[in-house]
From Swiss-Prot:
This is Acidic phospholipase A2 DE-II. Keywords: Calcium, Disulfide bond, Hydrolase, Lipid degradation, Lipid metabolism, Metal-binding, Secreted. Its main location: secreted. InterPro entries: PLipase_A2 (IPR001211), PLipase_A2_Asp_AS (IPR033112), PLipase_A2_dom (IPR016090), PLipase_A2_dom_sf (IPR036444), PLipase_A2_His_AS (IPR033113). PLA2 catalyzes the calcium-dependent hydrolysis of the 2-acyl groups in 3-sn-phosphoglycerides. It comes from Naja melanoleuca. The lineage of its organism: Eukaryota, Metazoa, Chordata, Craniata, Vertebrata. It is an enzyme of class 3 (hydrolase). GO terms for molecular function: calcium ion binding; calcium-dependent phospholipase A2 activity; phospholipid binding.
Length: 119
């Protein structure tokens, strides 16, 4: 769920607040469209698509589904024992949080003009 995703981000990117990723580029935060502005934005596009796939599992609501995962020390390696939906959502979040840690954060891509740059 989004709260657990926030915690994963804080684990993998401890030097930046999670909310810096909530309105970044064309895909981090609300919806998404157009071409990702950089690698970090591509992480969010992949995460959005991953949640879309998880939603195809009967009764799976990624934004609110809770799951178990191993506590972190800079990288997240395991999602623990979960049912199919929870495992899918956890893996979406784990992959994205680790992707965020590898990608460069460009301040110019925070809070961009969505209508002008993301069509």
């Amino acid at each position: 769920n989004l709260y657990q995703f926030k915690n994963m981000i804080q684990c993998t990117v401890p030097n930046r607040s999670w909310w810096h990723f909530a309105n970044y580029g064309c895909y981090c935060g609300r919806g998404g469209s157009g071409t990702p502005v950089d690698d970090l934005d591509r992480c969010c596009q992949i995460h959005d698509n991953c949640y879309g796939e998880a939603e195809k599992i009967s009764g799976c609501w990624p934004y609110i589904k809770t799951y178990t995962y191993e506590s972190c020390q800079g990288t997240l390696t395991s999602c623990g024992a979960n049912n199919k939906c929870a495992a899918s959502v956890c893996d979406c979040d784990r992959v994205a949080a680790n992707c965020f840690a590898r990608a460069t954060y460009n301040d110019k891509n925070y809070n961009i003009d969505f209508n002008a740059r993301c069509q």
